[in-house]
A protein has these predicted regions:
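FAD-site-proximal beta/loop scaffold in flavoenzymes
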Residues: 5-23, 110-171
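Rossmann-like dinucleotide-binding cores of NAD(P)H-dependent redox enzymes
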Residues: 18-19, 24-28, 34-107, 166-171
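Short, T/G/N/S-enriched strand-turn elements that build extracellular solenoid repeat scaffolds
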Residues: 1-3
Length: 171
């Protein structure tokens, strides 16, 4: 989200959320992939009012529709407000809350929460990973590997978030 800086309290990344000092009473989680869904589940379990927002047409967008539907139904039964096919716009952060518009089609709803968690746009950090003399092939910033997790350089293997989705280093 452009011009939105994570401060670790009102606006959080998933890493910052793991270190939060105070549990928010309410939170909007932007991105309903594995990271967003996990945070939605456990924050809700601890009593935070959770709104989970996904731009695509179902939560857990890299999973099959059937699995996502079962998880979404469970989330709704547990009290998580799931919004799919929804964009987050006009985010305004102040000392006590975050206000934003949730846009779905031609309908806009303004909501306010204590915090917003950004669970989108994980980027691999390969800078300084190896000597510049090692010609490691990257694909959109991620280390390219074969079926055995070997990189383009014989004997160098990679696994985890550095090879791309699904990004699960937060667990």
């Amino acid at each position: 989200l452009p011009d939105l800086e994570a401060d670790g309290e009102r606006v959080m990344t998933s890493r910052q959320a793991l270190e939060m000092k105070k549990q928010p009473k309410s939170i909007v989680i932007v991105g309903a992939g594995a990271i967003g869904a996990e945070f939605a589940y456990f924050l809700n379990a601890f009593g935070t009012k959770v709104t989970l927002v996904e731009m695509l047409d179902h939560i857990l967008p890299v999973e099959d529709h059937e699995t996502a539907a079962v998880v979404e139904k469970s989330f709704i039964q547990e009290g998580i407000d799931c919004r799919v096919s929804t964009a987050v716009e006009n985010i305004k952060v102040n000392a006590k809350s975050v206000k934003m518009d949730l846009v779905k089609g031609d309908k806009t709803e303004s909501i306010t929460a204590d915090s917003i968690l950004l669970a989108i746009g994980v980027v691999a950090n390969t800078e300084g990973l190896l000597s510049p003399r090692v010609n490691l092939k990257l694909d959109r910033g991620y280390v390219k590997v074969d079926d055995n997790y070997e990189s383009s350089v014989k004997g160098i293997f990679a696994a985890g978030d550095i090879i791309g989705p699904p990004w699960l280093a937060h667990v």
